Design a protein with these regions (language model features):
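Short functional micro-motifs and their immediate structural scaffolds
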Residues: 90-92, 132-135
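Extended alpha-helical scaffolding segments
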Residues: 1-41, 45-49, 93, 137, ...
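Short metal-coordination and nucleic-acid-contact micro-motifs, chiefly zinc-binding Cys/His arrays
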Residues: 75-82, 120-123
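Short recognition patches in nucleic-acid-associated and regulatory proteins
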Residues: 88-116
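Short beta-strand-alpha-helix junction that forms the catalytic/metal-binding core
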Residues: 112-133
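Intrinsically disordered, low-complexity regulatory regions of eukaryotic proteins
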Residues: 4, 8, 68-70, 82-83
Length: 540
């Protein structure tokens, strides 16, 4: 049943019924030929008969009408009529037609100023066979194309260097994406059963993603953002290559703005990359628990389970498409730019760290999470050298246990992490001995100054013993003076490296700061702030 409020649609068809035409009468007991005929309905004029349609004749009339549409922009015949696609001669039609909406003339495209609209066939033309192939292909491509999720497009267009602006992301324009699987071999070189399976797989893809994932099928949304399912016949064979097309605008009018075209992607590479991201997120539950006390909600975790979302946050919208192509082609990804953007976002949040603490935690999570992704990715593509990754769990375990003599501060990242951990521990003591004052806000980040390595050393680390003595918690802080001495000594030894790798130091500093959960209360109860900001993240 249809609800009264639901919109009803109807189709009125005028049929010319004859004894041997496209539509003809047949006895009620007549069974239409499978794949060649179809029942239209019972005859009202002849109750004992029904109307049957001849599909083969309908197809012929369909192509006649489609070719007539193409002829509206011009048709050429003779030896001088050459197909722009296959080179056949004799009969060609204009490509600017209704075969594909991208080739319509309803927008100010780069059409020849020397040709009238009905003479466009002299520009680009197709023979009838290629015109039919274009019609088939365009309809299939339209069925394989979908709109990217709004949360993903908002993530893509969000500022890469300002965390506060990312909170107030406006509606972004729609971006369309489509995935095509193309065979490596020419169809003439394929076995008949392979061609049949390929066509069946394309039809499966055109139906869209099913609720129940097919056996062996690969969902491509993780690495492409496109809700598309790759059937097992294609996903399990490298005899095919994937092509992704991203565009915006109004495709129905041919007003298309191409964003990216990524070709020659191996299905096996797509599968391995998808598995890598899934495994990476599963392995991040310990980090989620350390930062947020509980796993991220489904909506809040979406950006960390999407390759396009991660790349846009790491490198920005302007480099996201090229980075996506590099990743799908197993090429090197830069790390310095990702660290730079992470440092800028953390610096923006540090100005109001007590109010933006939950967002800062998300930035720290992304920094450690994507850094681990880069580490696994470089191993996957066989890239040698690079950088050393110290598992945050190992360093945090030693710091929590105050096993300072066992700590090997190897590099700027380890130094920044230890400094951040120590500042957070001292801030907690300062908070409980100063009527709940904020150490960073009131003593370190003052008068609009920016927090950097020199500021941390001069106004935080070097004054800790003095503040602890004046506020009478020097006894409680005495257990951490060994760590303070270690950090200051290492800073003096690595000063030049820190200045060259300032972003590395600061991102690691905030990682150590946020991962220090402590055993008592934090400087400020940020549960209400967390709930508000988490609700905002989940609503997007």
């Amino acid at each position: 049943e249809v609800a009264p409020s639901e919109k009803w649609l109807g189709l009125l068809v005028l049929l010319s019924v004859t004894d041997a035409g496209i539509f003809c009468y047949e006895p009620e007991t007549y069974r239409p030929k499978e794949d060649y005929e179809v029942d239209v309905g019972k005859s009202q004029l002849h109750p004992s008969r029904k109307i049957v349609a001849d599909l083969s004749q309908i197809v012929e009339r369909f192509w006649e009408s489609k070719l007539a549409e193409g002829e509206e922009k011009g048709r050429l015949q003779g030896d001088g009529a050459v197909c722009s696609c296959c080179g056949a001669t004799g009969d060609v039609l204009s490509v600017y037609s209704k075969a594909w909406s991208w080739f319509t003339t309803t927008w100010p495209g780069p059409l020849s100023i020397f040709l009238n609209e009905n003479e466009l066939v002299n520009g680009v033309a197709l023979c009838p066979d290629c015109y039919k192939a274009l019609t088939f292909g365009s309809n299939l491509f339209n069925r394989l194309t979908t709109t990217l999720p709004m949360w993903l497009t908002k993530e893509m267009f969000a500022p890469v260097d300002n965390a506060s602006s990312r909170e107030h992301r406006s509606e972004a324009e729609d971006i369309f994406g489509g995935v095509m699987a193309l065979p490596v071999l020419d169809p003439s070189e394929q076995r008949e059963e392979d061609r049949a399976e390929y066509v069946e797989s394309l039809m499966h893809m055109a139906e869209g993603v099913t609720e129940k994932k097919g056996a062996g099928a690969l969902h491509l949304d993780t690495i492409t953002g496109i809700e598309q399912e790759l059937p097992m016949h294609i996903a399990g064979e490298d005899m095919y290559r994937l092509t992704m097309l991203y565009f915006s605008g109004d495709p129905s009018r041919g007003d298309v703005h191409l964003r990216a075209s990524i070709e020659d992607v191996l299905p096996s590479a797509a599968q391995e990359l998808t598995d890598m991201i899934h495994d990476l997120f599963d392995d991040s539950y310990a980090l989620q628990g350390q930062l947020f006390k509980e796993p991220l909600h489904e909506r809040a975790s979406r950006p960390y389970r999407s390759l396009p979302a991660m790349l846009s946050k790491a490198y920005g919208m302007t480099r996201m498409w090229s980075s996506l192509a590099q990743t799908l082609h197993r090429k090197s990804l830069p790390r310095d730019l990702f660290v730079r953007h992470a440092a800028l976002r953390m610096q923006d949040l540090s100005r109001k760290v007590e109010d933006k603490y939950y967002l800062l935690q998300h930035e720290v999570f992304f920094y450690l999470y994507y850094d681990q992704f880069l580490h696994h990715y470089r191993q996957w593509i066989g890239e040698e050298g690079g950088y050393r990754v110290t598992p945050w769990q190992d360093l945090l375990r030693l710091l929590d246990a105050r096993a300072y003599r066992d700590i090997d501060i190897d590099g700027v990242a380890d130094l920044g992490f230890a400094a951040g951990y120590l500042v957070r521990r001292f801030s907690r003591l300062y908070y409980h001995h100063t009527d709940q004052k904020q150490f960073l806000r009131d003593r370190v980040i003052t008068f609009g100054s920016k927090l950097g390595p020199d500021t941390i050393v001069e106004y935080a680390l070097k004054r800790m013993i003095e503040y602890a003595f004046k506020l009478k918690f020097d006894g409680a802080f005495a257990k951490d003076e060994e760590l303070l001495g270690l950090v200051l000594a290492e800073y003096q030894r690595q000063t030049d490296d820190v200045r060259r790798q300032k972003d590395e130091f600061m991102t690691s500093f905030w990682a150590g700061y946020c991962l220090n959960r402590g055993k008592g209360k934090s400087e400020k109860d940020d549960s209400s702030t967390r709930e508000n900001e988490e609700a905002q993240l989940m609503s997007e």
